[in-house]
UniProtKB/Swiss-Prot annotation:
Organism: Mycobacterium tuberculosis (strain ATCC 25618 / H37Rv)
Stated family: Belongs to the glutamate 5-kinase family.
GO biological process terms held by the UniProt record: L-proline biosynthetic process; proline biosynthetic process
Annotated binding of substrate, by residue: 58, 145, 157
Biological pathway: Amino-acid biosynthesis; L-proline biosynthesis; L-glutamate 5-semialdehyde from L-glutamate: step 1/2
Annotated ATP binding sites: 18, 177-178, 218-224
Disulfide bonds: none
Any Pfam family the entry gives: PUA
Protein name per the record: Glutamate 5-kinase
Keyword Transcription regulation listed: no
A GO cellular component annotation in the UniProt record: cytosol
Amino acid sequence: MRSPHRDAIRTARGLVVKVGTTALTTPSGMFDAGRLAGLAEAVERRMKAGSDVVIVSSGAIAAGIEPLGLSRRPKDLATKQAAASVGQVALVNSWSAAFARYGRTVGQVLLTAHDISMRVQHTNAQRTLDRLRALHAVAIVNENDTVATNEIRFGDNDRLSALVAHLVGADALVLLSDIDGLYDCDPRKTADATFIPEVSGPADLDGVVAGRSSHLGTGGMASKVAAALLAADAGVPVLLAPAADAATALADASVGTVFAARPARLSARRFWVRYAAEATGALTLDAGAVRAVVRQRRSLLAAGITAVSGRFCGGDVVELRAPDAAMVARGVVAYDASELATMVGRSTSELPGELRRPVVHADDLVAVSAKQAKQV
């Protein structure tokens, strides 16, 4: 299969490769260092061809099962985190040993959703990853499951890999798992499931039924599709391919499903506002303000706000909601929640001089469609 979108992945200089738990485990769920070594070989070939590669690797919990004497993947949070703390050591050591065969050094980068959402930590993570690549080390990124809580069900690093792809300015994202690509329904349950080789936008997914989780990891097809759409919307093409065909996927992108990138890449700040930042509050708007913000791309003024919720400070990201509570945009708010509560519904001329700035400036505001809202 050839297409301009596959060619973009085949020729990408900067690449993020996400390796799912099922790509690193046996059918019984035990960590398999041999499978990891095979994936490292495929990545090495791509790097020898001139690409810079960052790896987002799942598998820490699976790698901790055997050393802790467990018979299966744990279900409770405390044991998952204990397994992750032990397994992360085994996981990064396995990557280190695999790349040592090629004379390469690896660096471990553990992140949480909170790290990505906070602007300072976000920037520090970006600098660390950029510096590792400049020093020709292979960055191995994983979610820090040991301290994560709800994020431990983040989607088996699918969403994290999409965020990292934009963070490092990657030219493409490759998601490797135990699946051939995208089908209109689960091919393991439906014999006549139709394979979808290319997705040009969310409209191509109408009628597609995606499973929510795998039995070994936490990321099912729904998680992978959401991550692929997120990255593609940010301007990064995505290939969803089977880990068994990793060599082919990384060599010429002729397998799996490709998700086409939007023509114009989102700026780092607008991407952070739309997808990465954690919203600490919400502003409910009247219908006129919704039109001004979404259709006319104008700044939000206090007069168009009908309600304020949450605790936030000036500089935080908040959700902007329509009268029916649907999120229509996200933006950087200029005032603390306590200040804003006194401004609701008031025209600019009624406010004191120090409170006449827009509540959310147009430059710090990103409209969000209904489908994008599900990816946030």
